[in-house]
Amino acid sequence: MAKFQPKVQTEGQDDGMREKMIAVNRVTKVVKGGRILGFAALTVVGDGDGRVGMGKGKSKEVPAAVQKAMEECRRNLVKVSLKNGSIHHSVKGHHGAASVELHPAPKGTGIIAGGPMRAVFEVVGITDIVAKSHGSSNPYNMVRATFDALVNSTTPAEVAAKRGKSVEDIFA
């Protein structure tokens, strides 16, 4: 059976949060009496200032699945440290067979990333970044790998605190 997956990412803004729908999958459960159709939606929500969340919702209808996914996004917000519209340093993230590499970029570069990663960067507030994905191109795995990378990035202050030095000593 063919996959139902719109390539268009929808965007909405509610209560200051940016919402993006990444994928909608049509799923089928085969039972004795025939097939039962359902839908699964993957969405991300962010405030454009470093907070981002992802969610997956399932239902018999698309709007209900998207609504459930958006609610889960708002429950699972995480804070990401940003530096002038980019990240502090290069970082890698993994989930399942998907792995991503994120590299900071100078102002004016834009978001150089494909598919689901681009949606995450847009809602979190990153304007300049270079990203590369390896392995699985499954949207769910790519979003989780991107979250893994963003959450594992550290600020210079955190590195200095771990080493017991000042921030100036880290850059010297």
Swiss-Prot record:
GO terms for molecular function: rRNA binding; structural constituent of ribosome. It comes from the Bacteria. The keyword Nucleotide-binding does not apply. Keywords: Ribonucleoprotein, Ribosomal protein, RNA-binding, rRNA-binding. InterPro entries: Ribosomal_Su5_D2-typ_SF, Ribosomal_uS5, Ribosomal_uS5_bac-type, Ribosomal_uS5_C, Ribosomal_uS5_N, Ribosomal_uS5_N_CS, Ribsml_uS5_D2-typ_fold_subgr. One of its GO terms (biological process) is translation. GO terms for cellular component: small ribosomal subunit. Residues 17-80 form the S5 DRBM domain. It holds the Pfam family Ribosomal_S5. Belongs to the universal ribosomal protein uS5 family. Part of the 30S ribosomal subunit. Contacts proteins S4 and S8. The N-terminal domain interacts with the head of the 30S subunit; the C-terminal domain interacts with the body and contacts protein S4. The interaction surface between S4 and S5 is involved in control of translational fidelity. With S4 and S12 plays an important role in translational accuracy. Located at the back of the 30S subunit body where it stabilizes the conformation of the head with respect to the body. This is Small ribosomal subunit protein uS5.
